[in-house]
Regions:
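C-terminal or mid-to-C-terminal helical accessory/interaction module adjacent to the motor/catalytic core
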Residues: 117-200, 268
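Metal- or metallocofactor-binding catalytic centers and their adjacent structured scaffolds
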Residues: 226-273, 442-445
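Intrinsically disordered, low-complexity regulatory segments
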Residues: 1-142, 148, 152, 239, ...
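Short acidic, hydrophobic short linear motifs in intrinsically disordered regions
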Residues: 259-262, 270-284, 309-313, 461-473
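Basic, low-complexity terminal or inter-domain segments flanking catalytic cores
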Residues: 2-3, 187, 229, 245, ...
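Structured, non-catalytic alpha/beta "coupling" segments that mediate domain-domain communication
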Residues: 14-40, 172-220, 327, 335, ...
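Phosphate-interacting basic helix/loop segments used at nucleotide- and nucleic-acid interfaces
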Residues: 56-82, 177-181, 283-284, 381-390, ...
């Protein structure tokens, strides 16, 4: 009696196979298996008929077709099928697609938040059915995103003829946030101001306060995971003229100084919550300089290896069992940090799915022990997750805060200091400013002036967003969900709507033009509040409160279809009103210029693209731009000859009969060729697509390497098999 477990990622196969043992077959769908077909009106792949939606699905790729064919054969050999796709809305939808394609009648559905034997066996002991509400929400999201993306791109974006490729429900709202900030920066007018301060012989510095008895709000704010730990220099209340600054300095120098108030208090700083997807991306970006998509890639590998729980979650909950394990760990290793009762953190309103936060599966596997097994990026991210999780279950930190007010004549001066008196959770996660201790002085005491001065400063424009800060903003605005933050940012960069400049996201001219256009023709759709409301409605579908077909058909009928029709009618007028719209059809973004060279592969005029890559000998390269009908070929400057050349791999790319294998490319079905390369000084051979035109584009992931068993294997496509 054999059972089948269906999962998404091949990275879990080995671990789950070890857990389940004999009597089980574990197979991976390799992610999404089906997608909406590119047919029908505007290639939507679905029809809106009254209040119903007729969807037409097709295998996502030739590889997906092959996987489905193999799975159909396996299903015939087993007695029971368990769907164990990822435990979220997306995973539920993939499970439904598998059940549909494999014609499974009421398959078992199991979910687990960690790949460990106890978790997997507990899930198998309590199987359930596929959640139709989650599936409905997943299907609604797919149709909604394609409706907005395909129709908006075809009828609006392409009409700009400026190189912009697409718009999207989440993509365009996120771009709008970046462009709004860029507009604020462009319009910003700096203003001079002065910070006035005094320094005393007793050993502290105080700053001018116009109203000394007006206390600042010191309530504990939510920790900022996107912030890097930098000391914020104190300032006085802003003085707006040199004359007033000079007057205050004169008062300080000509009058005695006396302490009029000393305030001392001890506050408890609560530990931060364990990581959600968003806070992990923020912290990894700030502390490890990881891009959001790279953070998720590393977290995925840690999850698949069984080291951490599922990494797409907006919950800060930890299981009772794990909280008890952390408490036991602290009792054995850091008894002073054991709180009186278990620390519970509240998830934000609207948090989805009954998941745990991102945490280690075994708290006793410390970062030091883990780094002896795995090093590099995985070890660094694991340490971040372990430290944050343990910190979340520790005692609060205790901070002694002091505030001193002095007076000279009619001017008042304030000094603030703080000292950490009990570290608490900061032993593992230090998000508190460094100590700044003030001397022990008494009210009424006369203090001796050492120096008085005014420092001229300028107001600064609002900063551009880093990737962690943008993730934080998307979460706070309700744009997207944990699974969409990093792909959205990646898409904006790939579309050349934004670029990273000194670690900050800056909209390109192309991105600014597109946003300015959409702000006039579809202003609602790019507003954060509008997009957030749509996310809430998708959540309501997931909770069974809304019918997905009625919601989407009415949304299209009542808002999107008329808004799109109106926008299409305004394209020509709005286009003329935009700056830089005198560029010709298909012209490249501002960072690109036409080169006097034609593509050697397709004859299209090459484009000169600026680049800061240290790998290049010049500050640019040539590209056969697909936006203008090119094939994607690139050429680099040979500084010795002064000529542009194809990459070395393509100059030698004409396959010889001897190099062609009997295997076919899984993407374009051309033969795979043997390609020699060196790694660590050793000569090696890999199989790659033999077609130089598709190799840099749609076949770029086709790379098979020889295993110790003599088979050919690819990280993306798995083991290579000869056609039957």
């Amino acid at each position: 009696m054999t059972k089948l477990l269906l999962i998404e990622s091949p990275g879990k196969l080995k671990k789950l196979g070890q857990i389940l043992g004999t009597g089980w077959i574990v197979k991976a769908s390799m992610g999404h298996i089906r997608e909406l077909a590119d047919d029908g009106e505007d290639a939507l792949g679905f029809d809106l008929e009254g209040d119903r939606i007729r969807c037409r699905y097709t295998p996502r790729s030739s590889r997906a077709s092959s996987i489905l064919k193999e799975l159909r054969q396996v299903v015939q050999q087993v007695t029971e099928v368990y769907i164990a796709t990822d435990p979220d809305r997306e995973g539920e939808t993939i499970g439904w697609h598998l059940a549909q394609e494999l014609r499974l009648n009421q398959p078992f559905r199991i979910t687990y938040n960690e790949i460990s034997k106890p978790a997997v066996m507990a899930a198998l002991a309590n199987p359930k059915t596929l959640d139709q509400n989650l599936i409905a929400a997943g299907r609604a999201r797919d149709c909604l995103d394609k409706l907005v993306g395909y129709k908006g791109s075809k009828h609006l974006v392409w009409a700009l003829n400026n190189g912009a490729k697409s718009m999207g429900r989440v993509q365009s709202a996120t771009l709008h946030l970046l462009c709004q900030r860029e507009t604020e920066i462009i319009r910003f007018v700096p203003q001079d101001y002065w910070s006035v301060w005094v320094e005393y012989v007793e050993g502290f510095k105080a700053f001018y306060r116009a109203k000394w008895n007006e206390k600042k709000d010191e309530t504990s704010s939510e920790p900022d995971d996107a912030a890097t730990k930098t000391d914020v220099l104190p300032e006085s209340d802003r003085v707006t003229s040199q004359a007033e600054a000079d007057r205050l300095v004169a008062i300080a120098k000509s009058n005695p100084h006396q302490i009029v108030q000393v305030e001392k208090k001890t506050i408890n700083q609560s530990p931060p919550a364990p990581f959600t997807t968003s806070s992990l991306q923020q912290a990894a970006g700030a502390k490890l300089r990881f891009a959001p998509e790279f953070t998720m890639k590393v977290a995925q590998s840690l999850f698949e290896a069984g080291y951490i729980t599922y990494m797409r979650t907006d919950s800060v909950m930890l299981s009772d069992q794990f909280c008890a394990a952390v408490r036991q760990y602290l009792e054995q290793n850091d008894s002073d940090n054991v709180p009186a009762k278990v620390t519970r953190h509240r998830s934000k309103a609207g948090a989805q799915e009954a998941h745990e936060a991102i945490r280690p599966t075994d708290v006793y596997l410390t970062p030091e022990q883990f780094s002896s097994r795995v090093n590099g990026d995985e070890a660094n991210l694991y340490q971040l997750i372990w430290n944050r999780t343990v910190a979340s279950q520790c005692r609060a930190a205790q901070i002694a805060k002091t505030r001193i007010i002095t007076q000279s004549g009619t001017a008042f001066w304030e000094a603030r200091g703080q000292v950490l008196i009990f570290p608490g959770y900061t032993v593992y996660w230090n998000n508190i400013s460094d100590d700044s201790e003030l001397p022990n002085v008494q009210q009424g005491q006369v203090v001796n002036l050492k120096q008085a001065a005014a420092e001229k400063k300028q107001t600064q424009p609002p900063p551009r967003y880093t990737e962690p800060k943008l993730v934080q903003l998307m979460e706070r605005k309700g744009i997207g969900r944990p699974s969409t933050y990093s792909p959205t940012i990646k898409t904006l960069k790939e579309r050349q709507y934004v670029e990273l400049v000194k670690g900050k996201l800056q909209p390109t001219q192309l991105g600014m033009e597109l946003d300015a256009f959409l702000a006039q023709v579809l202003p609602d759709l790019i507003a954060a509040e509008f997009t957030a409301k749509m996310e809430q409605e998708l959540d309501a579908i997931a909770q069974g409160k809304l019918n997905w077909e009625r919601y989407l058909t009415s949304w299209n009928r009542d808002y999107f279809a008329p808004a799109l029709a109106k926008a299409v009618g305004e394209v020509a007028k709005v286009k003329r009103s935009l700056p830089n719209q005198n560029r010709g059809k298909g012209s490249a973004p501002s960072s690109q210029k036409q080169a006097d060279i034609q593509c050697p592969n397709c004859g299209v005029q090459m484009t000169k693209v600026s680049s800061k890559s240290q790998k290049l000998k010049a500050d640019h390269f040539l590209s056969c731009d697909r936006q203008t009908g090119g094939c994607g070929t690139v050429m680099f400057l040979n500084v010795k000859s002064g000529n542009y050349e194809l990459p070395l791999s393509e100059r030698k790319s004409a396959p010889t009969p001897e190099s062609l294998s009997e295997y076919s490319c899984p993407v374009c079905h051309n033969p795979l060729e043997a390609y020699e390369y060196s790694k660590d000084g050793q000569a090696k051979v890999m199989l790659r697509c033999c077609n130089p035109k598709t190799r840099p584009s749609k076949c770029k992931d086709v790379a098979f390497f020889k295993t110790k068993q003599g088979n050919w294997w690819s990280p993306k496509f798995g083991e290579l098999k000869l056609p039957k």
